[in-house]
Amino acid sequence: MGNRGMEELIPLVNKLQDAFSSIGQSCHLDLPQIAVVGGQSAGKSSVLENFVGRDFLPRGSGIVTRRPLILQLIFSKTEHAEFLHCKSKKFTDFDEVRQEIEAETDRVTGTNKGISPVPINLRVYSPHVLNLTLIDLPGITKVPVGDQPPDIEYQIKDMILQFISRESSLILAVTPANMDLANSDALKLAKEVDPQGLRTIGVITKLDLMDEGTDARDVLENKLLPLRRGYIGVVNRSQKDIEGKKDIRAALAAERKFFLSHPAYRHMADRMGTPHLQKTLNQQLTNHIRESLPALRSKLQSQLLSLEKEVEEYKNFRPDDPTRKTKALLQMVQQFGVDFEKRIEGSGDQVDTLELSGGARINRIFHERFPFELVKMEFDEKDLRREISYAIKNIHGVRTGLFTPDLAFEAIVKKQVVKLKEPCLKCVDLVIQELINTVRQCTSKLSSYPRLREETERIVTTYIREREGRTKDQILLLIDIEQSYINTNHEDFIGFANAQQRSTQLNKKRAIPNQGEILVIRRGWLTINNISLMKGGSKEYWFVLTAESLSWYKDEEEKEKKYMLPLDNLKIRDVEKGFMSNKHVFAIFNTEQRNVYKDLRQIELACDSQEDVDSWKASFLRAGVYPEKDQAENEDGAQENTFSMDPQLERQVETIRNLVDSYVAIINKSIRDLMPKTIMHLMINNTKAFIHHELLAYLYSSADQSSLMEESADQAQRRDDMLRMYHALKEALNIIGDISTSTVSTPVPPPVDDTWLQSASSHSPTPQRRPVSSIHPPGRPPAVRGPTPGPPLIPVPVGAAASFSAPPIPSRPGPQSVFANSDLFPAPPQIPSRPVRIPPGIPPGVPSRRPPAAPSRPTIIRPAEPSLLD
């Protein structure tokens, strides 16, 4: 096998198998193993018991194996068994092992005859076994019995295919000798997933139960239905032997005697039997693992990379580290601070592309939602003019004023400034809600420690609420400051003279920068929601909003214009969301009760989210399209008061109206600039500093460290299992690395060498005795991988055969053919207890002059032979 590292391959695969089974998943990694497949009562379980040398598997009629049994055989000086689901217990009585298998099977499948794909992991340590990993699968059945579901045949087949379809699995196809090989369910399933026969090993059981005068010689010689890895025959105990408590070791001795004494099998007795099968499976599994090493290493590395992302927060410490709770607390708090800052400040590292972060949402509040709230409180023209006229009249009293009083201007401005408090405080509330949501998102990584997560959220949320009071006080102070002094000397204020010049202007909309250009305020997709089905139903268009009109096009290329709607006399109203609709809708209508589009009094425009609706409303406000007033207006009284003004009073009202509009715009601009700065300084930046510098101290003072770091049972189990798998994968990669660098690669021998069969069938039928090669050096396994090997890979001089014997073999070539063609292999190893009969014409002691045969000599299978794989 190369070196000691190769001998550790099977235990390594066992360790990975245990790690993955304990996690409850296969980690998408196909581990090399041997799956035992066969019909019901074909003798699969008996073969496994013969390997172990103990009776430990359930027996009975019908389906006995109802869950896959992953059997890990490990060579050890002591003999005991362990189950993965109860690691702490060592079973020395194998009757208890059988009872535990039955109990564990019933625990998952119930006491009826149902099956389950969840495997049972059993590890057997014994001085009588070779390292092997096998999977005992339920026997293939046709008819449901008892409480089995009617599709039991397909359930079992699907379960078997789940295990044998993996390219890394060898298939041990068990077929009884008293059954026609062409009808073998095991070989049929094996051919479905392994049509080339590269992974299939045939096992023929019940050779002693064949009808008198028949034998399975053609099958075992790989003539009838050839497999690349050949067939091995075994003889198990009969039911009478089992009931009579016949010892397995006595059964193995009887098996050995059967093959030595049977005339059809004695010439191949050294290649038959349970010990040879066990040795062959050990060799082939080890070689199979060696061939799978590159792909296995690649899969291990890929799995390790995916695991590193999941265990990043606790991969630097082991579960048995006594200081891990302190490390975990520090690491969790630091990670929480980093995550919070990234979500607020933004980061190019690991950007979330599915939803907006907390910082992006706060930015939208500052620059879309808050300006929208400011503009939404836009005063009504008629109400404002009426208030100005009342203020002028009340200031003059009984006197008739000749000049426009500036006190009326100050009174109206102060009244408008007070209205700013509500949208400003609402902005603070929106930001606080986003901050709290961000804290909850960041603490989701602390879910392993429920108490720590709860305390962290409580402490940070309490601090945010404290900062809320400070921030709101500061914002109210800013508004009071604006109200305390009306600075009419501001550089942006139009002044009295300009206000009089503008008194003749009737259009209050935003001035366009250049006469030849149209200011585009917003573009985007909207759905016209209230077009009747007779006219095509709801349709999506590309809308373009300017300072003068709303246009929509077929697509974003803006080539095919569908309609252009002037903004004069338009207003916005909310529309309730439909019961089955996931769209958010608002409507545009004409205040003069005119149709807006074709025969529609209002256009209902639909967006995907409420945020898009708010953003479009803010854009319409910039264009001068305001929301509909909720309260009913006394239009008659307003008209009466407005139109009853004399021309001089009307000019004074218009002048003050322009002054108020100019000064309120200055205040709005100042508030829009100071609000984000105030909130950032007093709330967001202070919260970040608190998390980085004071949160840990608050956590230590609020509760005991041990209680904070108490894990939920599920999270602790998941974390420990994941860490175990992580370290097992790293250890596996290290072992594979050592093997890869220190193993001397040799050409892999052919899976089957049946040249002895070919030579026997292609020459004279005269029975001859074949000489035997020298014995292999102790401790070295034969170089041939297949269970039915041909001649040895190391040629032996003919003269050396004088001390050994060989049984008679039919159709052995005569001496003329030996000397005529010196390229033939020397005779294969045979049983060393038979007397020597030297073929006539061969002088003893004459060695071959040909060089030793290469170990990678290709296998030749005669095309005339029928094949299972055709």
Curated annotation (Swiss-Prot):
Source superkingdom: Eukaryota
In-chain residues carrying the UniProt-annotated modification Phosphoserine: 764, 848
Compartment(s): Cytoplasm, Cytoskeleton; Cytoplasmic vesicle, Clathrin-coated vesicle; Cell projection, Uropodium; Endosome
Effect upon mutating residue 562 to E: In CMTDIB and CNM1; with neutropenia; COS7 cells show a reduced uptake of transferrin and low-density lipoprotein complex; impairs PHD domain binding to vesicles composed of 1-phosphatidyl-1D-myo-inositol 4,5-bisphosphate; does not affect GTP- and salt-induced disassembly; does not induce the formation of high-order oligomers; does not affect phosphorylation
G1 motif: annotated segments: 38-45
Biased composition, class Low complexity, residue ranges: 796-806
Domain GED as annotated: residue spans: 653-744
Assembly description: Oligomerizes into a helical polymer that self-assembles around the vesicle membrane, when associated to the menbrane through lipid binding. Interacts with SHANK1 and SHANK2. Interacts with SNX9. Interacts (via C-terminal proline-rich domain (PRD)) with SNX18 (via SH3 domain); this interaction regulates ATG9A and ATG16L1 trafficking from recycling endosomes to sites of autophagosome formation. Interacts with SNX33 (via SH3 domain). Interacts with MYO1E (via SH3 domain). Interacts with PSTPIP1 (via SH3 domain). Interacts with CTNND2.
Family statement: Belongs to the TRAFAC class dynamin-like GTPase superfamily. Dynamin/Fzo/YdjA family.
Extra remark beyond the main annotation: Overexpression of CNM- and CMT-related DNM2 mutants in COS7 cells, whatever the mutated domain, led to a reduction in clathrin-mediated receptor endocytosis associated with MAPK ERK-1 and ERK-2 impairment. The membrane trafficking impairment process may represent a common pathophysiological pathway in the autosomal forms of CNM DNM2-CMT neuropathy.
Protein name in UniProt: Dynamin-2
GO biological process terms held by the UniProt record: actin filament bundle organization; antigen processing and presentation of exogenous peptide antigen via MHC class II; autophagy; centrosome cycle; endocytosis; G2/M transition of mitotic cell cycle; membrane organization; membrane tubulation
Region (G2 motif): 64-66
InterPro entries listed in its UniProt record: Dynamin, Dynamin_GTPase, Dynamin_GTPase_CS, Dynamin_N, Dynamin_stalk, G_DYNAMIN_dom, GED, GED_dom
PANTHER family associated with the record: DYNAMIN, DYNAMIN-2
Phosphothreonine PTM sites in chain numbering: 755
Membrane topology: Peripheral membrane protein
